[in-house]
Amino acid sequence: MLYTLIVGLGRSGLGLHVPVLSRARSQVPGIFADHPIVGVDPGDTARAERRDLLIADSLRRARDLLEPARTVVHLCTPPAVRAEVLREVAALGFSRILMEKPLAGDLDTLRCVLRLAREQELRLAVVAPWLHSTLTRRLVQLVGNRRLGAVRSVSVTQHKPRFRRSLSTGSHTSAFDVEAPHAVGLLLRLLGDAQLRGARCADLRVGTTTVPDMGGAHLELLHTGGIRSAVLSDLSAPVRQRRIVLGMEDGSVVGHYAVGQDDDFAQWEITRDGHTTREVFRDDSLTACLTHAYRGYAEGGDGTGAGDLGLHVRTVELLDEAKRLADLSPAGGTHPHKEALSHGR
């Protein structure tokens, strides 16, 4: 059975992974060892004690509390320091690594991560709840069986208010790293590989404070089959929304992903011949994602499969290109692709 080490006790590690794993350990027998989850926070930002969490003051101390050969490491540190922490984790003998999305924040970090994985024989998997979502599975089936004919276009909207975290922490430096990795991975799964056709980002402004590149992100893709897709993520929106719209040859589909762990239900609306049907269903995608990874590791695999890792690599490549395109500016000029979202205080 497998032990758990969570590295990085911020929003993802402490706020999402710990409670989801605590539930999964009681729901999925035969995979998880009867041992507390061990957590380490390299940034020393979280000292909250929980009954189901044992906090170690260093990675070396965590190694002494666990068996590295039977431990899954959840790497929940910010993208900018991920390669450095991965190197330290690997040096301590851990090899099963479950990484928060995105796999890397840029191409240099991606190359470093993949090189470490090869040299240290790491079994990498990426936390990608949308790829394990019931809604995604239904969408893949609908596109594949051509129930509504061929896909004409797809758009993904990812809105949420992220003021406090963007103003108080530097865990992310680009809106392309917050919600967009979910959407790009989903689009690659649904429609196949793609080329970037446009990108822009927005600064977040609250009163006199500006957080560069954290107001929102927009990108456009052209897939190999000729289908166009778009992603729009507004991190200053007043409400949460995670929506996908498929324009089909014989109708349309609107899907709504669960917007938080407090209400894990998704829904979709299918319109055909002027008639719309709506269905609501349970969709605990993060639990499904983590248990899938643990089952893969328990069976001796890499947690997700080589194909999934390739999809995550391609996601990083497209997002890195989007960041560079959004930052393009003529000499001496302003950013032509950058908007500013301004909010009074």
Feature map (PLM): residue ranges:
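Hydrophobic residues in well-ordered beta-strands that form the structural core
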Residues: 98-99, 124-126, 255
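N-terminal Rossmann-like dinucleotide-binding module
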Residues: 1-52
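NAD(P)-dinucleotide binding in Rossmann-like oxidoreductases
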Residues: 224-294, 308
